Amino acid sequence: GIAYVLERHDTIIVLEDDICTSPVFLEYMNNALEKYALSTQVMHIAGFTNLDIPQFGDTYFTPHMTGWGWATWKDRWNNHFTHFKTREEALQGLIDKDLKRIEYNGNFTCLKSLDKNPIPWDICWEICIYKQKGVCLHPTQTLVKNVGISNGTHFNNNKLFGWYEYDRPFRTKPIILKDIPIEENPTIEAMYAIALKDHG
């Protein structure tokens, strides 16, 4: 579906069918797609964050992507996305330090998804972004809520991210896209590692 849309359009906003969005979600997505259209290091716009850190402003960058409402550009996807067929193909060129970085030193064991057949697209995109030294824009407060997660196949804890609950209210105040450095924030990354600890 993503490739089909990007054959016809320069950008795409993706929503799963069990997602409820903030009233400011679409404005944020469209503004971010426009603002970073020429900043090719920015590869993904996320609507969900498992953090709640308004003290850091309205947005932040991280190498980690999230689904549940996201966007990207044709050039990023077409130039860099690979749907890997095997674990070996996905991890080609990466060393142990890279694997630890992707999995936040074991707090986010996402690479086990490479053993699935077929390999899910999201871990492929995560690795592609990392290999390109790309970053993903996130709001400091979530703009989406997954209203179907409690009935989902993989749901087994209402606090999958430790103290960061999925069912907290989403932000309704418009996002101001200020000119922040296009790089990860070490303090936020440390918080992210804690928030990802219980998600596998």
Ranges and model annotations:
Residues G1-V14, I19-G200:
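An acidic/histidine-cluster motif and surrounding catalytic segment
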